[in-house]
A protein has these predicted regions:
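A generic structural signal for alpha-helix starts
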Residues: 46-47, 239
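Conserved beta-strand position immediately N-terminal to the Walker
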Residues: 38, 231, 316
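Basic- and hydrophobic-enriched, low-structure N-terminal and domain-boundary segments
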Residues: 1-43, 50-57, 62, 85-87, ...
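H-loop/switch region of ABC-family ATPase nucleotide-binding domains
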Residues: 319
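Conserved H-loop
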Residues: 323-326
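P-loop NTPase motor domains
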Residues: 54-313
């Protein structure tokens, strides 16, 4: 007896239309299966991006499901702006000299969330974007907590919207002060300071400062779960692009936890992640303690894939080779 796969496409006219099979029949994927996530793989020119465009336009235009597209190159998704069924689509090109700027303060976090939880998540974002060997993650965590305290925050305080947020530049200065006051040997102190200032400093220099070193964000944390957006990451460079990608996924993850919805037969939000090998790598015996950002980001995204399914968040990943991810 052959039992069909639960995730197999169907020929009934329901759900997302994928196209036609070799016999000319229309093929669909039931919408409720998308919350189990999806992977599109194929060589360049095989139609991955076209398929992602097709699926995202259906989700937003026909089902009114908000989508977030994280596009590392080519700027092809801005074509969705011509879709009359997606009038509320926002396209951002952070770091580029153009008319689609994006500003996001990493220290902003959803109302109702405890600060200590966001600090933990933000440290994971840094670990996934930059190579941080011990004790650098601890120093980043301590620096983040201290700059919040400078604004009157306490770690176990719940965000009620009444306090101001720190900035990346404040973290840059705070980490240097923490190291100056530490008991590390002079050479170790100097090396740690140089490493951290290079990494954090990359988020405040030139165009990056216009993106991350800002007092307020273009969209509030809550709006990211409601808006349909395309983020063009090409102008950021790999580290900053990974930082922004993980930061946005973190905000959505925090919002989903804060505002869970009862079980329903469709996703409430969908993230499209192009060129996923930039963040996700093959299984490895490497220990996260070696400071490998790819190991940390892979672990973070794998955990998120497992967690957000129950929260009706779908993640659609596209890449050339499945073996480059697994």
């Amino acid at each position: 007896v052959e039992i069909p796969k639960e995730s197999a496409p169907v020929y009934e006219k329901r759900g997302l239309h994928l196209g036609r099979d070799r016999s000319g029949y229309d093929v669909y994927v039931p919408l409720d299966l998308l919350a189990k996530h999806a992977l599109l793989a194929g060589v360049p020119g095989s139609g991955k991006t076209y398929s992602m465009l097709h699926i995202s336009s259906q989700l937003s235009g026909e089902y009114a499901i908000p989508v977030l597209v994280l596009e590392p190159a080519k700027k092809e998704y801005r074509a969705l702006a011509r879709n009359t069924k997606m009038p509320d689509l926002a396209v951002f090109s952070p770091g580029a000299a153009g008319s689609f700027p994006l500003r996001i303060n990493p220290f902003e976090f959803p109302a109702g969330l405890k600060l200590s939880e966001h600090i933990t998540n933000l440290v994971q974002v840094f670990e996934g974007a930059f190579d941080l060997t011990p004790p650098m993650p601890f120093l980043v965590s301590e620096g983040i907590e201290q700059v919040y305290r400078d604004h009157g925050w306490y770690p176990f305080e719940v965000n009620d919207g009444s306090r101001s947020y720190p900035s990346i530049r404040e973290l840059y200065d705070k980490v240097a002060k923490l190291l100056d006051a530490s008991d590390y040997a002079p050479e170790i102190r100097s090396n740690l300071k140089s490493c951290l200032q290079v990494r954090i400093g990359s988020l405040i220099t030139r165009e990056m400062g216009n993106v991350f070193d800002v007092p307020a964000s273009t969209l509030s944390p809550e709006e990211w779960l409601q808006a349909t957006c395309v983020i063009e990451l090409e102008s950021l460079g790999p580290d900053a692009a990974n930082f922004l990608t993980l930061l946005l996924m973190t905000l959505i993850r925090e919002l989903l936890r804060q505002h869970p919805k009862a079980a329903q037969d469709r996703p409430r939000h969908v993230i499209f992640l192009e060129e996923a090998h930039n963040l996700i790598g093959p299984s490895t015996v490497a220990n996260a303690e070696n400071g490998d950002a790819k190991v940390a980001s892979t672990k973070y995204i794998v955990n998120m894939l497992a967690e957000v399914r129950a929260l009706r968040e779908a993640i659609v990943i596209a890449d050339q080779l499945p073996t480059g991810l697994a």
